[in-house]
Amino acid sequence: MDLKRYFNAKRANAGEGFAARPGDTGWIDSLRGLQTHRGMPFLFGSEIGPDVLELRPGAPPAVIALPPTMASYVLFVQVAADRPSASPEGFGEIGPATLPVEGNPLGDRVATYGLRYADGSETDVPVLRRFAIQQNHISWSASAFAALPLRAPTVHASTGEDFVLGRAPGANFFQGEARTQSGRMDRQGENVWLYALPNPYPDKELSALSLRAEQEISLVFAVTTTALTQHPLRLQGRRKLKVRLPPGFHLNKLGELDVDDRGQQIGMDLGTVISARAVLEYSRADWLGAKVDVQPVRCGSEVIVEYSAHPDARLYLRPDDGRLHMFELRSLEGGGNASASLNVATVEPATRPVKIRIMEKDSGVRVAARLHVHGAHGEYLPPKGHHRKVNTGRFEDFSGEFANGLNQYVYVDGSCEADLPLGPVFVEICRGFEVRPLRTIVDITASTDTLTFELDRVLRWREQGWVSSDTHVHFLSPQTALLEGKAEGVNVVNLLAAQWGELFTNVADFDGRTTFGAKDFGGDGEFLVRVGTENRMQVLGHISLLGYEGEMINPLSCGGSNEAAIGHVLEATMADWAERCRQQGGLVVMPHAPNPQAERAADIVLGLVDAIEMMSFNPRTAQLSAFGLADWYRYLNIGYHLPLVAGSDKMDAAALLGGSRTYVRLGERDFTYRNWMDAVRSGDTFITVGPLVEMTVEGRRPGGTVSLPRSGGTLTIDWRIESVSVPPARVELICNGTVLEEVRCGGLSCKGQLSLPINESCWIALRVRGSVAGREADIAAHTSAVYVKVGGMPIFATADAVSVLAQIEGSIAYMDTLAPKSDEARHSRLRAALELAHHRLHHRLHELGASHHHAPVHSVHVEREH
């Protein structure tokens, strides 16, 4: 409707109740000419002359003549005057309020709208404050009850996704995570309101509208009519369509059509497209088979469109050529083809509430697990309380979820609720390396209320004295870490506080005392979380300090960015941190071998390191690092007995807690965190991404020593491997870093015995090949070493010693040239530890008569051979 001849005021000159405020965007002034809002056309006033209809108490009603019009609803764009907040009665003068009450008053009769009909009859409808109309500026939650903001809801990509797409974030981090905004501006920003006045006589022709102010001023910006039979502002719940895209469409880097409010590829008039993601096609045979990791294929020509819309909405598609294609939603949802160029299939709505329970088969006890559910079209079906799309950005999702390639999972404590579609539903449930993973297909019917799944614990290594652990987890809350640990079968989770430039994480979770999940702290003692620290320097390296008591070992980082802040001087070395950790009863671990290769060499030579860690964010992407193991071999080859541990270094939802983990044999010890640390120090460990492996050499376990006479002898090596999913492909017997024997495996378990003649001191370990993702060369497991002394002679490889010495020399060079000093005395003291390590290893080279070469190092050595 064109209201130009009825406009009687300038919105810019409206009274005090309509004045702009700081934080306004000027959006109201952009409402000019013909515009569409929430899929409805409105004609707004131009900048020339009056541009709004002001209804003022005492003034005669505005009568707007209509051509003969059949309408079910009349829609008004309008706003009431801001009403100053009044102090509550009886309080006198009051201070600032955290939650102001602007817009909360309700029920006053702002105006009366009359519908006049061609037959001469008339109907009056009251327009009440905060029902059909609301003021411009409102406080949080002061929504109108029967009107919507004119602004429609918008959908946002997450902050990380915007960066992937090469554009600036469209919303702040929080809104990006929420992925939506309602259109209501509260606390800051301006609003106008859209009200659909129902016509009680839709079968009678309208001839005019009569708008009369009652108790206060209001402004009418625009009016339109509709013949829709259902309320034009009431949308349906979420629905989905599987759409085969016409030619000319390309999915973005996320595998989606861009539904961000800045996008142009897809949209709806009377509704909102929530997402348009590529169809994921799963192999039914693989799903029901023995494959470790069943990934779907992302389809480039079909998308699942999820939306909330009015039944009479239209879907719009715009391909690369810019032409706009329109399709009636009723036709699409009816299952027919809207046109020859658009093939659609309805996706059964997920509306059946189902309780999911996960039990242990033998005991019937409810157990935590990792759960994935998807529908017949590959659509992910998260339980209530979890994201429909897991955010894999670093430091962006701590919600007990996991994204493994294209599969998404939630962590549940044995029970959850999910809205599921009728028909086949695909379920995967995992619970660590001793429980057989479950993949199945269940049929949901109209009578399905509960799904109960039983998990079969087929391996019993825990009962044999083994416990599993992840030495390296970040960002999760202790309770979330405890849940994920339970669900992944990880008995010990080490959650590490850390510094990242100016960012500090998990610091408030550290108290130097609490072991979450322990019996002393209200748990059952079977799954534990302990907060330690990862203390870090960009050049000299990182060190994990686990389980220490008392005060936090600070600084968490130093020596400048990125680990510390710019300008943060070198006020500690890793040796300094390690000594303090030992003094406070903790376990010192060198994380994520082989990097950074610098001071770790000195600290190992000084005997300050209890274990060395191999790291894998997610075994599907990369398993146990050959480079990290080669670095560990180097230290074993010069006589430093370091147990192996493993951790995930989890920093995002794409990293799997316990994906690479340590198994530690407690033996006769009770399971406590302190006993776990002692067991790690004793060295009977193995690391794995699936297969469990045990080895003895002449009955001695890893961490132990076999002594032989100077003449040597033949050693008997016994081993066994068991797995619930990742098959061991072959077993390699490693001696001093070299493969001496190789045995092929078949199936999920194997065992054997080898004889090995030995005539010099060495170390022996088992390395297991096998893959989560089907890569033949992947390393799936590795034991710590058994040490063999022949005639009391040491293990010492000169080339490895020289390599380690060079790392120490490099660390000294850094301290002498680039390290930002605190003060001379402290710097000299810190440097002295590195000099001591250099002296010890250098002296050992001379003591053993090993010829070696020094690299030129600033102020330490000149180039020479001896």
Which residues fall in each region the model found?
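Catalytic cores of extracellular degradative/oxidative enzymes
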Residues: E434, R462-L644, S648, A654, ...
